[in-house]
C-alpha cells in the first residue's frame, strides 16, 4: 500500500516537471522571434511616417489671390431714427370738439384741417366786435363833420378856440376807439380761425388723444394728436471721440458725407442719407459724440425710434491690396497669412492690416497684388508643407468691397 502511494506521487511529480519543462522550452523558443519583430517594427513605422509625409495625400486647402481695389473707408456706430419734427397738436381755444378730419396713421400736409371746435361762440364774438367797430366808425364820421364845421366857424370867430380844440380831441379819441375796435375784430377773427385746428407741419399723425364731443381746453397737455415729420427723417448715432478729427477733416474738404442706415442684423441696407451736423460736445461718460444724418425717406423704410446700424463713408483708399478676411489669422506675433508659392508650398507671412469688414481685409504691408493666400484648411498647415488647392481660385475682384452686409468692423481702419 505504501509502495503504491509512492508510485502515484512519483508519477504526479513527473507530470509537473514535464509540464514545467515544456512551458520553459516554449517560452524560450518564442522570445527570440518576438523581440526582433518589435525592434524591426519601430524603424518601419518611422520610415512609413516619413514616407506618408512625403508621398501621402496632400492637405487640401482653398486659396484666393490678393488684388488691388479702391476700398471705401466707413465709420460705424449705433443709432436711433428720430422724426425731423415732432409736434403735439393742441387747441388754442376752449370749446367742444365737434369733428376730427384725419385718420390715425394718415400722412398730412402742413395746413390740412385736423379738427373743428364748435365755432358758434367765436362767431358771436366776432359779430359783436364788428358791430362795435361799425358804431364807432359812424361816431368818428360825425365827429369829423362837426370838426370841419367848427374849423369854418372859427375863421369868422363864431366858435371859440376852446370849442375847436375840444372837437379835435373828440375826433382823435374816436380814432383811438376805432383802433381798439379793429383789434377786437382781429382777435375775434383769430379765435374763430383757431377753432379750425390745422396741421402745423407735414408728417404722419399718430393715434387720436381725444374723441369728438369732449370739451377741450388750450391747457390740455395731451393735445388732440401727435404729428411726426418723417419726410425727411433724421438719424442720430454715436462715434468714438477718436473719429472726430476724421469727420471734421472730411467736412472741411467740402465733402457731402454719405450715411447709410442698416437694419439690426447689419444684413440689409435700409436707406441712404447725408451728414447733417455734429454735436458740440463729447459725452464724458461714454467718450462718444452724437452725429445727426438726414434721409429723404420717401419710401418710409425708416420709422421714428427705430434702432439701426449707421455707416458713414469718409474716404476711399485707392489701389489697396485686398484679401479675403478668412485668410488673415492672429497669433502671438500679430496678424499673419499663409502664402502659397508656385509649387503650392505654404509659408507663414506676417502682415499689417488696414480697412476690414466681414469679407475682405486691406493689407497695408506684407503682401503684394497677385500673391496667393490660403483661405480654408489653415489648421492643417505647417511651414513649408506642400498642399493641394482643391477648388478653383477666386479673386477678391469678383467680390464687392466693402461687403453690403458687413458688421461694425467694416467701418474701421
Curated annotation (Swiss-Prot):
Transmembrane segments: none annotated. Keywords: Cell inner membrane, Cell membrane, Membrane, Signal, Transport. Pfam families: HlyD_D23. It is found in: Cell inner membrane. Coiled coil: none annotated. Disulfide bonds: none annotated. It comes from the Bacteria. It is a peripheral membrane protein. Residues 397-413 have a biased composition (Basic and acidic residues). Residues 31-57, 391-413 are annotated as: Disordered. GO terms for molecular function: efflux transmembrane transporter activity. Residues 1-20 form the signal peptide. GO terms for cellular component: efflux pump complex; plasma membrane. Its main location: membrane. InterPro entries: CusB_D23, Multidrug-R_MdtA, RND_pump_MFP. Belongs to the membrane fusion protein (MFP) (TC 8.A.1) family. Part of a tripartite efflux system composed of MdtA, MdtB and MdtC. This is Multidrug resistance protein MdtA. It comes from Salmonella typhimurium (strain LT2 / SGSC1412 / ATCC 700720).
Amino acid at each position: 500500500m505504501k509502495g503504491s502511494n509512492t508510485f502515484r506521487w512519483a508519477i504526479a511529480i513527473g507530470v509537473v516537471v514535464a509540464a514545467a519543462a515544456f512551458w520553459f522550452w516554449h517560452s524560450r523558443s518564442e522570445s527570440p522571434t518576438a523581440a526582433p519583430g518589435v525592434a524591426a517594427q519601430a524603424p518601419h513605422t518611422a520610415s512609413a511616417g516619413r514616407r506618408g509625409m512625403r508621398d501621402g495625400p496632400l492637405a487640401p486647402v482653398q486659396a484666393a489671390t490678393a488684388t488691388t481695389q479702391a476700398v471705401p473707408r466707413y465709420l460705424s456706430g449705433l443709432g436711433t431714427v428720430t422724426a425731423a419734427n415732432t409736434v403735439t397738436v393742441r387747441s388754442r381755444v376752449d370749446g367742444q370738439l365737434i369733428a376730427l378730419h384725419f385718420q390715425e396713421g394718415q400722412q398730412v400736409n402742413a395746413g390740412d384741417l385736423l379738427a373743428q371746435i364748435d365755432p358758434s361762440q367765436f362767431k358771436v364774438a366776432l359779430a359783436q366786435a364788428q358791430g362795435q367797430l361799425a358804431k364807432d366808425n359812424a361816431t368818428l364820421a360825425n365827429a369829423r363833420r362837426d370838426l370841419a364845421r367848427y374849423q369854418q366857424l372859427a375863421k369868422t370867430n363864431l366858435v371859440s378856440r376852446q370849442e375847436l380844440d375840444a372837437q379835435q380831441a373828440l375826433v382823435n379819441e374816436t380814432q383811438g376807439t376805432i383802433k381798439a375796435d379793429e383789434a377786437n375784430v382781429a382777435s375775434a377773427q383769430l379765435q374763430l380761425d383757431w377753432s379750425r385746428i390745422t396741421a402745423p407741419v407735414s408728417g404722419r399723425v399718430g393715434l387720436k388723444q381725444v374723441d369728438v364731443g369732449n370739451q377741450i381746453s388750450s391747457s390740455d397737455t395731451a393735445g388732440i394728436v401727435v404729428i411726426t415729420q418723417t419726410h425727411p427723417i433724421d438719424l442720430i448715432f454715436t462715434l468714438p471721440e477718436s473719429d472726430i478729427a476724421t469727420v471734421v477733416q472730411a467736412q472741411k474738404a467740402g465733402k457731402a458725407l454719405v450715411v447709410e442706415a442698416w437694419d439690426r442684423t447689419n444684413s440689409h441696407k435700409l436707406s441712404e442719407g447725408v451728414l447733417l451736423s455734429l454735436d458740440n460736445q463729447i459725452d464724458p461718460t461714454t467718450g462718444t459724440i452724437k452725429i445727426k444724418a438726414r434721409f429723404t425717406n420717401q419710401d418710409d423704410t425708416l420709422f421714428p425710434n427705430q434702432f439701426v446700424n449707421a455707416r458713414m463713408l469718409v474716404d476711399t483708399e485707392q489701389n489697396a491690396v485686398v484679401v479675403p478676411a478668412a485668410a488673415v489669422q492672429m497669433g502671438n506675433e500679430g496678424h499673419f497669412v499663409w502664402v502659397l508659392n508656385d509649387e503650392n508650398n505654404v509659408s507663414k507671412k506676417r502682415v499689417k492690416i488696414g480697412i476690414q469688414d466681414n469679407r475682405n481685409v486691406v493689407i497695408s504691408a506684407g503682401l503684394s497684388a497677385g500673391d496667393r493666400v490660403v483661405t480654408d484648411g489653415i489648421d492643417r498647415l505647417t511651414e513649408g508643407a506642400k498642399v493641394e488647392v482643391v477648388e478653383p481660385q477666386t479673386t477678391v475682384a469678383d467680390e464687392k468691397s466693402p461687403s453690403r452686409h458687413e458688421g461694425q468692423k467694416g467701418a474701421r481702419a
